[in-house]
Amino acid sequence: MFVRWPYPSTATRIEPSMSLSPFHLAIPVHDLPAARRFYGETFGLEEGRSSAQWVDFNFYGHQLVIHEHPKTASQEHASTNPVDGHDVPVPHFGIVLGWEQWEALAGRLRSFGTQFVIEPYIRFQGQVGEQATMFLLDPCGNALEFKAFKDMGQLFAK
């Protein structure tokens, strides 16, 4: 799969990889217009089908669907888990990018004035699984993580 980041604001078309099956993830949002702007404009994700209650997005070749729904308990009472000295929001979802793609995304998000839960940084430096990571919330409280591995071959390494 390849990703070309538009900088700073044009949409990108990401094609699913033939070697990895696209996943489908549906998440609740209590403010559909704000979430639509966030995923469409901030990330430049291509919009697919939609209705008055939901919107499909091409999330790096995967299908992300935002569904309008009242706030959920997980959005009202976020949990965290300590990882590498940071309180990681749980639950969260995201994508593993290439290093340069991650750097471009971090720059894009900063240019939009994004408030990070965990600022972009390098985790597990000098260890197996060294990775760049950042965490943020969408306007409805859903936590996202974007990461890139120094060595992609260590994605599942112990």
Please provide the spans of the model-predicted regions:
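Short glycine-/small-residue motifs
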Residues: 143-146
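Vicinal oxygen chelate
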Residues: 16-23, 46-99, 103-137, 148-158
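Ala/Thr-enriched low-complexity intrinsically disordered regions
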Residues: 10-12
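Conserved beta-strand-loop-alpha-helix junction that forms the acyl-donor binding cleft
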Residues: 29-31, 128
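Conserved active-site tyrosine of GNAT-family acetyltransferases
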Residues: 35-40, 109, 141
